[in-house]
Every structure is written in structure tokens, then in C-alpha cells.
């Protein structure tokens, strides 16, 4: 279940209690602070491993289920952070309630997020962006299908991703589940997540996005390994 749905549910505590009883494992919902720290540690590790990116002004975008987080890094250090209610599931749910058909789905998603995209552009208007790193459960499996090797970070052409987005908008759920190796429920936000990233990158005039390959959750957790130094720097900088 997407964390934003759990955090906003009236019976969240009851659901967590039942999950704990059924599994025998203590469970809690990740809050915004938890996710922000995870994303920061992950991006900090990417920049450390990519010297060229580490010298640039990099905007990291994490399109989560309910919110989109943006972090601006200059020479490897975070200098600005913003969060917006523009998550992949949130957008997909809102557009679904509009009754969009496949013919209008892509344009309806763009229209729905346009206002928030303009807010993002305004927030970073005084900061020239050299590169974008896009992180998320939707953009990563989609972009990974374009990867030519097993590098942990790929550079995805925006025009190519835009063509994939058009395919996503007309594809059946079963086909999407098989292609991107996700369950059927997780296919619903795929298009919204990809579009959010493309719209942000496009507004800043970037022709490509750097995308970590593989599954987002696994990469976030493995990114914690050896991250003690980054964690201390996170506290200091943020």
C-alpha cells in the first residue's frame, strides 16, 4: 500500500496493528522525514560515485506515491529542498476520478500537474540546473528497459521517454505488469510518475535524465550501506 494512503487513512493505526499481528513483525509507516533522509542518502551516494555529476548543479527528483521531493545539489552539497503534493498515485487517482479515457489520459495528467510544475519552476528560477536525477518506483523500471548495460545509473533521453509515455497511456494493465515486472495495481501510477519527471526536466530545458537502474525500494535500501558519513552531513546541511 502506498505510504501516503496509509498516512492519510482514518484507520491507519488499526491496519498497522493487524499487519503486526498477522506477520509478527513490528510495522510503522514511513513519514516524510524518513523518506527525505532516504532519498538524500541515496542521491549523496550517487554523486560521490559520479565525479562529473558531483561537480554540477544537480536537481534530484523523487516522485513518491503522494508527494514529489526535489533537492538541489551544488558540488555535492544540498542547498535547497522542496516538497509538493504531486505523487504518482495521488495524480493517477485524481485523473482517474475525472473519467479520462486512454485517448486523453496523457494530456489530462499534464494538465493536472501543470500548476504544481509552474510552482517548481518558480522555486528554482534563480538556480540554473545542469542535470536531473530522477528517482521513483515508476520512472526507474520504465527507464531501465532502455538501459544498454548494467551500469547503476543510466542517462535516459527525454524524447525517447516521451515516446514510451505515449505507449504507457494506451497499454493494458496486464501488458504493463509483464513488461515492467510489477503487480497490476502498481501499473496505475506508472504513467503519472513518468510524466511528472518528464515535465520537470522539460521545463528546465534538459534533454536527458539520469535514472538509477533497478527497483527503487531496493536501491534506496542498499544505498544506506556505508552511509554514516552522509547521514551526519544530512543533519548538518539540512
Model region roles, listed by residue range:
Residues 3-55, 72-74, 80-238:
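Helical "lid/coupling" subdomains associated with nucleotide-phosphate turnover
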Residues 60-64, 134-136:
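Short beta-strand segments
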Residues 66-69:
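Acidic, divalent-metal-coordinating active-site segment for phosphoryl/phosphodiester hydrolysis
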